[in-house]
């Protein structure tokens, strides 16, 4: 899980979602998980 000031999709399967007021990227590839913070 990366914590970045700006989250971007890395591949086609990445999805940007909002959860509990935080922007997240979820993906099949665990290396692509990100949260904005």
Curated annotation (Swiss-Prot):
GO terms for biological process: translation. One of its GO terms (molecular function) is structural constituent of ribosome. GO terms for cellular component: cytoplasm; ribonucleoprotein complex; ribosome. PROSITE patterns: RIBOSOMAL_L36. SUPFAM superfamilies: Ribosomal protein L36 (SSF57840). Keywords: Ribonucleoprotein, Ribosomal protein. InterPro entries: Ribosomal_bL36 (IPR000473), Ribosomal_bL36_sp (IPR035977). It comes from the Bacteria. Belongs to the bacterial ribosomal protein bL36 family. This is Large ribosomal subunit protein bL36A.
